A protein has these predicted regions:
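Short S/T/G/P-rich N-terminal loop/turn motif that feeds into the first structured element of a domain
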Residues: 1-181
Length: 181
């Protein structure tokens, strides 16, 4: 499976279109003849309150854990609450990992993408500044008694039963990439 990511771009970039660009001509001539299935364009927008340590000026990492979440219609609030609380706690306690949470603006059914880039398998995707940090206790102190258990349970129930969550590991291949400029 191959995924082409064009980002970060503004809405104006998409308004101008790319059909007449050199990149598009190259893509059509050298890549599209080998594409078996094309899912089409999907546009996403990052939810800053649910993300942490995301910096558009940094170059890409070697790998990305890419999780797709499909929420039950009308029941996503609990999932958003847990993700927002998790991000708030990690930001407040010096967590070094990176997470971007994106919602699908157009190009498919309603879904969220949780993107966690990293450079090496077998290495934690972030640590807290205090090595003795207790995540569960700190979560409950920040958001209320037994909040972690309650939030986790309700967030899980917000996700569709069938095909509601799946995770893929993506690999960045520089030879197949262009600049983010």
């Amino acid at each position: 499976k191959y995924m082409r990511v064009v980002g970060p771009k503004s809405a104006e970039f998409f308004n101008q279109g790319v059909n007449n660009s050199e990149e598009y001509a190259y893509w059509m001539k050298n890549v599209m003849p080998y594409v078996k299935d094309q899912a089409g364009n999907k546009r996403t927008a990052r939810l800053k309150d649910l993300s942490y340590n995301w910096d558009n000026s940094e170059g890409p990492k070697k790998y990305v854990e890419f999780t797709t979440i499909r929420l039950n219609p009308g029941e996503g609030r609990d999932w958003f609450t847990m993700m927002r609380n998790d991000a708030k706690l990690k930001k407040a306690n010096g967590f070094t990992g990176i997470r971007g949470v994106f919602w699908l603006v157009s190009g498919g059914q309603s879904e969220m993408h949780v993107v966690e880039p990293y450079d090496s398998h077998g290495v934690r995707k972030g640590v807290f500044s205090d090595p003795d940090f207790d995540y569960n206790d700190s979560y409950n102190e920040m958001f209320g008694w037994r909040a972690r258990t309650y939030d986790q349970m309700n967030a899980g129930m917000s996700i569709r039963d069938y095909g509601g969550q799946f995770t893929e590991t993506l690999e960045f291949i520089p030879e197949m990439s262009t600049s983010i400029e």
